[in-house]
From Swiss-Prot:
Its main location: cytoplasm. The keyword Cell cycle does not apply. The gene is coaD. Its EC number is 2.7.7.3. Homohexamer. HAMAP family: PPAT_bact. It comes from Bacillus subtilis (strain 168). It is found in: Cytoplasm. This is Phosphopantetheine adenylyltransferase. Reversibly transfers an adenylyl group from ATP to 4'-phosphopantetheine, yielding dephospho-CoA (dPCoA) and pyrophosphate. Its cofactor is Mg(2+). It catalyses: (R)-4'-phosphopantetheine + ATP + H(+) = 3'-dephospho-CoA + diphosphate. Substrate binds at residues 10, 42, 74, 88. One of its GO terms (cellular component) is cytoplasm.
């Protein structure tokens, strides 16, 4: 049986921190489904379709990555994909506290799917999509935080607004 993982997130936008976790997950698992989700507590800058397209562009050279979106519960998506793992990135203790809640719920819903926490590399420990959007909104350079395709998309988005 293939080792399949789901790497979920809102990815609004995808950052080098996200890519760090995705790429490292791709070295561990035979197949990684990157699942773009809507976070109901956030107002996204990019549509789900735009986020999927950006992710596909920046992961196109990784053959065992598939980018999709899903509505509903993450655990149901993982079951549909026959995934045995959910891959989550952590930057700090505060991330762990937040992620533990979701993991605990997922364990109640289906205890056969494990959650793997991966610490991001230190150079990305401060990085978040919110910070990237804030810097880009005020015309700051985000080239150290996101791939060039994402930087261009941010510039275009804020020029429109």
């Amino acid at each position: 049986m293939a080792s399949i993982a789901v790497c979920p997130g809102s990815f609004d936008p995808v950052t080098y921190g996200h890519l760090d976790i995705i790429k490292r997950g791709a070295h561990i698992f035979e197949q990684v489904y990157v699942c773009v989700l809507n976070n109901s507590s956030k107002k996204p800058l990019f549509s789900v379709e735009e986020r999927c397209e950006l992710l596909r562009e920046v992961t196109k050279d990784i053959p065992n990555i598939t980018v999709e979106t899903s509505q509903g519960l993450l655990i149901d998506y993982a079951k549909r994909k026959n995934a045995k793992a959910i891959l989550r990135g952590l930057r700090a203790v505060s991330d762990f506290e937040y992620e533990m809640q979701g993991t605990s719920v997922n364990r109640v819903l289906d205890e056969s799917i494990e959650t793997f926490f991966m610490m991001t590399n230190n150079q990305y420990s401060f990085l978040s999509s919110s910070i990237v959007k804030e810097v880009a909104r005020y015309n700051g350079s985000v080239s150290e935080f996101v791939p060039p395709e994402v930087e261009l998309a941010l510039q275009q988005k804020f020029r429109q607004g």
